[in-house]
Amino acid sequence: MIRRGCIIHGKNVGLHGDRTSTGAHCIAARSGMSVMGLLKLYIGDKTTPCPKCGEVGVIVDGDYRHSNSAAVAVDGSAILCRCPQGTHFLIAPGTIPQLSVAKAGITPSFAPEPEKHAQTGKKKKREITLTIGVFFDGTGNNAVNTQNMMKAYTAGHYNLDDPEAESILAKCARDNFGVSGSGATSYTGYYTNIHWLSTLYSRRFAEDNPNVQRAVYIDGIGTDARKPDSTLGQGFGISDTGVIAKTNKAVSMLADSIQAALDAVSNQQADNKLIVRVLQFDIFGFSRGAAAARHFANRIQSEDPAIISAIRQGVTGTDFNGSPAGKTRFIGIFDTVAAIGTPVNGLNPHSADTGDVNLLLRPGVAEKVFHITAANECRFNFALNSVKPAWPELALPGVHSDIGGGYLPVTKEHLFLTRPATETVPYSQPGEKTQAYRQAVAQLQTLDKSPCLAPLLRTNEISAETWHDDRLPPDRYGQMQKRSFAALTLRERTVRNDWPRVALRVMLEAAQEAGVMFDSILSKDKELTIPDELASLRDKALAMGKAVRNGQTPSTFSQDELDVIAEKYIHCSANWNAIVVNTDGLIHGGASPSEMIGFINRPDEQWQRTVYSMDGKKI
């Protein structure tokens, strides 16, 4: 074996003929720099057909710090094909095999064309409509990190349906990936509806159908694949993992995605000359990803030069008759929460001010828009950015991630529904006899009036709990004293993550009405199966969505139906959790964090969600 001897920032440089994680070989497309006679690989270079999915892959990332300003492919560089994102990547070992790659029949793509191909006759024209589906995941959601985490988790023979899975995942994230706390959010959650939509998005091309689709998945705000999550991005939606940065990432992936789609069609249509008659987008998003989807759609409508340039690069070598920046066919969004912290609004994500993020969806921005919102969400930091009355919007039961997804299959909730009240009392005084306890009990009247909480209160046991901190000195009379706390709690509650599958189907139907093509959900897809007790409620939700899209007033769920959903399937996202609970489930410590920073999931005023119109006014 011959040592490769070419390394950039600790990683081996990719060379012509290198294998990939799926067994394909990489093909250099640029003449110039070589190592031992093998040309270097760069972003945009392709692979032989992937043995797993059959599609030619495209190298989509590398090291941008190379001296000649080109992005050089290195060991681990991602490769885009039809395989799940994160599973196909370049393998650049430290040595070069003695066997020449030329013997394997892998020729650089810039090599002179054989004479017999140069003399091909006139080809028949074939017009296609190319649709790029762009899928913006939610804040703290990253399908690549989730997938890698699931592999590590299952390798440890853990059960994902274990209610304690969240704590086990946190340990796995720390032990296997070196991430913890807020840096591990995307490693300890689960797949969202954005992930499922991107995997179901049909990439099949039929000879009798001119429609071609290609999916581009964008990881969620505050996250990067295989990196710790960003506190700044998750908290305020800004910086290099913020909302606008994610739309920039989508633009940077356009050219390669377009070229890969055209290459796949060309491989099936070798005797035809392709003409792209229309290039259009389907754009999906959840949470801040929904804000990114809206901002990206506005960039398309305004004919952003960066998008025009990316499209031109992607269609190079193919006739293109569409609009320079393309157009948007469908925007499908789940519970838009922009929550942008800016210097102007004092870094307050509750503010209507979204800085440079453009949420306004003007007429003509897309052929169809559909927004599903969370009827039971009421957190202060999760104000809703509505699209009503300009576009159809349906509120379904559930909180934010009951609609967009991302909860683990089974979770156990230990929640403080009120901010703990506190007072210093004699050590012998029972907690139930304190003013703090009476204040906590009195707040139950406020909770009872909240439509967001009503189904949960009807179907779960709410308790008034007391605890104390006895690490206090005696009073001036020498009497022992304690710091007594009290709060309303919701404890030992097990919740399943099946309801988001209903919202997924409502969005699928809306998108399909707009012409979007998806593969069918198969009965073997257990992760997307709906429990029998939710089947009729799914049908009702589908009918409600159709009514809203037709401009009609939808029916509503009855109290009994809401209680069925709430008992086991609606999470309680709003809480005052900043309290330490020990391994025995006992509470200790107080409530010192500030409301803005420490209680990030605290409820909005009166447990009523703040809703902003597209022009930033409270509704």
Model-inferred region functions:
Residues 112-619:
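Active-site- or binding-pocket-proximal scaffold segments within functional domains
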Residues 1-115:
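Intrinsically disordered, low-complexity proline/glycine-rich segments
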